[in-house]
Regions:
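Glycine-rich "substrate-gating" loop/helix at the edge of Rossmann-like oxidoreductase active sites
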Residues: 4, 35-49, 70-82, 110
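Short, hydrophobic alpha-helix immediately C-terminal to the catalytic nucleophile
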Residues: 15-19, 54, 89, 115
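Active-site Tyr-X1-5-Lys
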Residues: 2-30, 35, 58-62
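Short, conserved glycine- and acidic-residue-centered signature motifs
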Residues: 10, 49, 149
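C-terminal substrate-binding subdomain of Rossmann-fold SDR/epimerase-dehydratase oxidoreductases
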Residues: 60-64, 68-187
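Structural element of the ATP-grasp superfamily
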Residues: 18, 56, 155-157
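Oxidoreductase cofactor-interface core, primarily capturing Rossmann-like NAD(P)-dependent enzymes
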Residues: 27-32, 40-43, 47-55, 60-65
Length: 187
């Protein structure tokens, strides 16, 4: 089924423009499709606080609680922004001109539910900031469907690019410290 939402169609149109210009050899371009990224910004004014993990870490610092606006059963592929930057740097500095197609999914290739990510944030708060924030789930759905998401990112290892899951934990700890320091209410 096709997604006709303006967000999706505008992104797909942009992808087509990049790939067409690449095919015409006007640019050397690739398309990165980003999964659910998170990480500390350079400035607190950065437009990043609507990212799920960033929002939850900010909540932990400001409110000392985590509030989900869903059941939390949704599966997502989470990746740290530092790993995204590293992958982009590899593409910029490497020779990937011979690739058949320039579409790459940037993700870890494994899923976690939103609720499990919130629980991980609770655990990392305890470890990093010595506080365990409460977790509130806004509502439960009648569905018990916990089918896993498989965000296909297998092209990266085939190019010799490997991701390290421990970097997600490091980034999460850094984000929690950033939020605690930046938003002034140390946990």
């Amino acid at each position: 089924p096709k997604n006709l939402h303006p967000y999706a169609t505008s992104h797909l149109s942009g992808e087509h423009a990049v790939l067409a210009a690449n095919d015409r050899r006007e640019i050397q371009g690739v398309v990165f499709r980003l999964s659910n990224a998170f990480g500390a910004p350079v400035s607190k004014e950065a437009n990043c606080w609507n990212l799920l993990v960033n929002d939850l870490c900010r909540q932990a610092a400001q409110k000392k609680t985590l509030s989900l606006r869903s059941s939390g059963k949704e599966a997502r592929d989470f990746i740290s922004l530092s790993q995204v930057c590293s992958m982009i740097e590899l593409f910029v500095s490497g020779d990937f001109a011979s690739l058949e197609t320039g579409v790459f999914n940037l993700g870890m290739g494994s899923s976690l539910t939103v609720l499990d990510m919130a629980r991980l944030i609770q655990q990392r708060c305890l470890y990093t900031l010595s506080r365990f924030p409460a977790l509130h789930v806004s509502y439960e759905t009648n569905s018990d469907d916990l089918s896993g998401l498989k965000y296909e990112s297998s092209r990266m290892p085939s190019l010799g690019i490997y991701l390290d899951a421990s970097k997600n934990i490091q980034e999460l700890d850094h984000l929690l410290k950033y939020c605690s320091h930046t938003f002034g209410q140390c946990l």
